[in-house]
């Protein structure tokens, strides 16, 4: 019922729905549609132009109507939304048969919002058309107006004034200084809308990022003070603002972001306050080569983990990973020779990629970001048993060690990779058990991190944030464990858990301190 209400509402979002396995006499959807998931994004036509496409079977030419209409954005993975028709032609011409154009001008891209319904409650994955420019109320009133410039990944701005923070639509990933100018343009539209101006500007702590440079230019142009907020702290603050919290513990798992120590953070346990944070735990770091191929080859990431441990892969393992011995030797040489120019990363998403390869369900190449996460989620959702009912031979594979380093806890997954290197090729029907066992281990790791933080903090409220906690299997498992141990858990609902929500947390911190 809630999904139906959302689909028919004026907001007209895309709603994430689970595929039905049994459709009776109805024609099933082709497996080519979203093959990496058991879900589909479904929406009704939100405009007259799209409704005409749905209704075209009534045209005089007698062309057959659609059984279903599959759409996707014009922006390639990692690219910002595009408005210029000539640029759209250039982007899509190589793999497009025909273009259907219109002469309506678009001031700013504001695509459909994306929602999911879980346990009867709506969660916003992409806050855009229909929700923007509605504000996020919080427990308090901002003593000053704030303009927040978000981050480069899933860029968005927010304008905080009075008792609410108004985040913009997601703009996409910024790849140049010129592309970042749209942040100032969108902020100025919010200023016109509210008839108010910011008293200060806030941006990401990485001052070399395009969004931070644009924020600095805007602040200088208008003679405004500029402050910074670390990205993972802002993740936590966004969820805290939504629930009216001033301080809490936070688990933030995502694809990585700038850390104050010069490393890439991405699997963090923080004590979060409006005026700062303490970092208590993270996953063990690894060297990440700054090459596109390293992100596209899950098998390579798995083998690099073994290289770090000092374990040579067997011939059987290389065959299972579909990697030639000579190719592995080249990867090993490049990895060892290039580590002094690498980024040291704690990002949780790379753990997903490597584990997906170790289980044997990863593709040879990841053609889009977070692909392994979706594949693991697909198989884990198919698992018919609870985490407690998973046979021990599966659960024991995903082992981790916890070590303490000067009031800082490290979750080391080395034993997981050693175990996965020794398994026999799993059967297809075992993949759900492997995936669900991995999720159970991640939840256990989250509990271990929060338990360590509780040695130094009296906080019992825990917020879950970051892209990986958009995965309901992980968020549910983690919330259940933490609740059983006496914590009160808060999750995103009105705000996205990914980087597009960071601007809200930035505005909350800067405006209230």
Model-inferred region functions:
Residues 278-292, 333-340, 487-493:
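Short beta-alpha connecting loops at secondary-structure transitions
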Residues 1-202, 206-217:
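Active-site-adjacent structural elements in enzyme catalytic cores
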Residues 195-208, 226, 457-470:
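Short glycine-rich phosphate-binding loop at a beta-alpha junction
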Residues 222-235, 460-465, 472, 478-502:
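Conserved phosphate-binding/catalytic loops in two-lobed NTP-binding clefts
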Residues 151-190, 312-314, 321-322, 326-344, ...:
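A contiguous, well-structured pocket-lining segment that forms one wall/lid of small-molecule binding clefts
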Residues 145-148, 202, 248-252, 463:
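Short glycine-aspartate micro-motif
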Residues 48, 68-80, 254-264, 338-360, ...:
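Conserved phosphate/anionic-ligand binding catalytic regions in large, soluble enzymes, centered on
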Residues 232-253, 257-259, 298-307, 432, ...:
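Glycine-rich phosphate-binding/hydrolytic loop that grips phosphoryl groups
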């Amino acid at each position: 019922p809630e999904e139906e209400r959302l689909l028919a509402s004026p907001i007209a979002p895309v709603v994430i729905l689970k595929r039905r396995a049994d459709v009776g006499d109805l024609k099933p959807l082709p497996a080519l549609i979203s093959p990496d998931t058991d879900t589909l994004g479904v929406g009704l036509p939100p405009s007259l132009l799209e409704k005409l496409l749905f209704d075209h079977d009534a045209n005089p030419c007698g062309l057959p109507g659609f059984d279903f209409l599959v759409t996707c954005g014009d922006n390639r993975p990692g690219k910002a939304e595009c408005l210029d028709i000539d640029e759209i032609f250039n982007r899509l011409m190589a793999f497009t048969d025909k273009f259907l154009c219109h002469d309506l001008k678009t001031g700013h891209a504001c695509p459909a919002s994306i929602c999911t319904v879980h346990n009867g409650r709506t969660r916003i994955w992409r806050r855009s058309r229909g929700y923007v420019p509605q504000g996020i109320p919080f427990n308090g009133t901002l003593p000053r107006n704030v303009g927040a410039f978000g981050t480069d990944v899933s860029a968005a701005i927010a304008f905080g004034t009075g008792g609410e923070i108004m985040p913009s639509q997601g703009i996409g990933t910024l790849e140049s200084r010129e592309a970042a100018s749209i942040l100032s343009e969108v902020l100025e539209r919010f200023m016109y809308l509210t008839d108010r101006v910011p008293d200060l500007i806030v941006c990401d702590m990485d001052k070399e990022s395009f969004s931070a440079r644009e924020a600095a230019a805007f602040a200088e142009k208008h003679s405004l003070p500029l402050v910074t907020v670390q990205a993972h702290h802002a993740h936590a603050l966004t969820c805290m603002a939504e629930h009216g919290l001033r301080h809490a513990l936070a688990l933030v798992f995502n694809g990585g972001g700038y850390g104050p120590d010069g490393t890439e953070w991405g699997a963090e346990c923080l004590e979060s306050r409006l005026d700062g944070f303490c970092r208590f735990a993270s996953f063990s770091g690894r060297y990440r080569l700054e090459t596109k191929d390293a992100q596209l080859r899950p098998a390579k990431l798995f083998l690099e983990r073994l290289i770090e441990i000092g374990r040579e892969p067997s011939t059987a393992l290389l065959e299972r990973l579909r990697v030639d011995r000579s190719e592995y030797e080249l990867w090993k040489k490049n990895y060892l020779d290039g580590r002094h120019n690498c980024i040291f990363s704690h990002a949780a998403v790379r753990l997903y990629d490597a584990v997906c390869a170790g289980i044997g369900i990863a593709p040879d190449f990841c053609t889009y970001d977070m692909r392994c996460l979706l594949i693991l989620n697909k198989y884990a959702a198919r698992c018919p048993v609870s985490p407690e009912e998973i046979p021990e031979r599966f659960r024991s594979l995903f082992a981790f060690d916890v070590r303490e380093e000067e009031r800082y806890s490290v979750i080391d997954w080395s034993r997981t990779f050693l175990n996965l290197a020794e398994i026999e090729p799993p059967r297809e029907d075992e993949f759900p058990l492997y995936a669900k066992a991995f999720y159970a281990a991640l939840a256990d790791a989250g509990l271990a991190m929060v338990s360590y933080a509780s040695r130094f903090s009296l906080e019992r409220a825990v917020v879950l944030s970051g892209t990986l906690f958009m995965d309901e299997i992980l968020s549910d498992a983690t919330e259940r464990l933490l609740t059983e141990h006496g914590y009160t858990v808060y999750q995103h609902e009105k705000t996205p858990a990914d980087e597009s929500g960071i601007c809200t947390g930035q505005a909350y911190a800067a405006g209230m301190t």
